[in-house]
């Protein structure tokens, strides 16, 4: 077998009559398998002259003629045909020589099968329901797709079309060719998945873009009620989320568990995706599944994030909720409100807000009493759910400090966007909630800081 693998004709001849040409190894492969797989014409000819069994299958059902088609050796395939090899033989998966050639883009083999052997009947489905055309699409064999010109876009057993197979495996050239050949775009398989959904689910960004540009609908739901936005939000693929949003993917679609893309991304801590969805204006009031037996109320994305202990995302969602409530109450405002402060719900690390953030920290950790932050939150129209979500993280005797600090930073976010005077607002609210001592200290420190800046 080693001699056949190396095309070592001298050794094969030296072994002479003592050579058992039909000996098999543990994989049930003979020397002919290795000679053919290595595209070793001389060794193949020698073995055929010694009356080797040309149709011997290995443990996977692969005969030498399969290997000739698989590795694209037309000369050796012809030798095997002349030696009487079974031309319709199939392996354990139902693959014949045409399937093998199609998978590996060996167009000359397929042309020989169709034109010389006159065996178009080999153009049939394997055990998975895939015809050679579909297999060529699945493996990105674009030249093969061009010569298999029969105009069909047949679905396989699970309903996957060639476009599904090419898209989910990331074969951009094949996807583009199939889009040119066929008018169909949004066929679904048995799971209700389109080619676009499968491409997105497998993070094939180039294919997703090609399909979207060709007019594929990103909002077709699967049997599980998922749109293409669900799997990419769950996996945290922010570039694909952005791409789908640019092509009008609906943000508020609920799957079978009534989860939106925001529920999934919030629960798994996908901060970048959460930011994109919040900026897209996702509905924050949507609740996931209500469990009737346990009488458990469905949760909003905020509740899901709080349960998952995703502190940053909890604060982002509260900021978004307060921001959109403010915008709704002030419809006269337009996008110019973001000219100085671009919209973001992430943590604020800007130098120009450093003093205000320092004031918020001192107030929360050194000046406010345990229930003071809640009184401020109530005055600033924080909802009960928002307050509860803040309280879900951190417990203990001094946890109110962290809770108050987070609440103040969330409040500051909207004040900055509204372009108010946060220091003045804070002073007035502290007076209203009975914290004159804290208010005076904050104002005095702010004045001293201002004087220091002027002197310097």
Predicted regions and their residues:
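Solenoidal tandem-repeat scaffolds enriched in leucines and small polar residues
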Residues: 83, 87-174, 181-185
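Conserved ankyrin/ankyrin-like repeat signature
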Residues: 11, 42-43, 75-76, 108-109, ...
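Ankyrin-repeat-protein effector appendages
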Residues: 151, 181, 214, 247, ...
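Ankyrin repeat domain, specifically the short helix-to-loop turn at the C-terminus of the second helix
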Residues: 13-20, 45-53, 79-85, 112-120, ...
């Amino acid at each position: 077998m080693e001699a056949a693998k190396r095309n070592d004709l001298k050794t094969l001849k030296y072994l002479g009559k003592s050579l058992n040409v039909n000996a098999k190894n543990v994989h049930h492969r003979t020397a002919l398998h290795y000679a053919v797989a290595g595209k070793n014409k001389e060794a193949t000819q020698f073995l055929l002259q010694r009356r080797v069994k040309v149709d011997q299958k290995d443990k996977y059902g692969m005969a030498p003629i399969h290997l000739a088609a698989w590795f694209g050796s037309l000369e050796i395939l012809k030798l095997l045909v002349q030696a009487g090899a079974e031309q319709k033989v199939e392996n354990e998966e139902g693959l014949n020589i045409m399937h093998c050639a199609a998978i590996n883009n060996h167009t000359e083999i397929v042309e020989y099968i169709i034109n010389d052997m006159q065996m178009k009947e080999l153009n049939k489905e394997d055990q998975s329901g895939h015809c050679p055309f579909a297999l060529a699409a699945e493996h990105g064999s674009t030249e093969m797709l061009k010569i298999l010109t029969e105009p069909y876009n047949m679905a396989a057993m699970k309903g996957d079309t060639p476009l599904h197979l090419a898209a989910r495996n990331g074969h951009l050239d094949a996807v583009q060719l199939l889009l040119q050949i066929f008018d169909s775009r949004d066929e679904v398989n048995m799971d209700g998945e389109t080619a676009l959904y499968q491409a997105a689910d497998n993070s094939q960004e180039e294919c997703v873009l090609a399909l979207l540009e060709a007019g594929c609908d990103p909002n077709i739901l699967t049997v599980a009620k998922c749109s293409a936005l669900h799997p990419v939000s769950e996996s945290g693929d922010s570039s694909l989320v952005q791409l789908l949003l640019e092509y009008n993917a609906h943000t508020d679609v609920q799957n079978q568990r009534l989860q939106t893309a925001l529920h999934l991304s919030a629960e798994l801590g996908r901060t970048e995706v959460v930011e994109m969805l919040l900026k897209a204006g996702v509905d924050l009031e949507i609740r996931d599944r209500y469990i009737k037996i346990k009488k458990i109320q469905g949760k909003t994305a905020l509740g899901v994030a709080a349960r998952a202990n995703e502190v940053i995302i909890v604060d982002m969602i509260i900021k978004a909720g307060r921001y959109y409530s403010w915008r709704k109450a002030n419809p006269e405002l337009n996008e110019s409100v973001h000219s100085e402060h671009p919209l973001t719900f992430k943590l604020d690390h800007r130098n120009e807000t450093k003093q205000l953030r320092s004031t918020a920290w001192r107030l929360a950790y050194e000046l406010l009493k345990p229930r003071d932050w809640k009184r401020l939150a109530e005055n600033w129209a924080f909802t009960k759910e928002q307050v509860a979500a803040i309280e879900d993280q951190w417990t203990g005797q001094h946890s109110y400090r962290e809770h108050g600090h987070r609440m103040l930073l969330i409040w500051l976010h909207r004040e900055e966007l509204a372009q108010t005077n946060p220091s003045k607002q804070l002073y007035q609210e502290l007076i209203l909630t009975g914290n004159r001592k804290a208010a005076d200290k904050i104002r005095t420190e702010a004045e001293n800081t201002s004087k220091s800046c002027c002197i310097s």
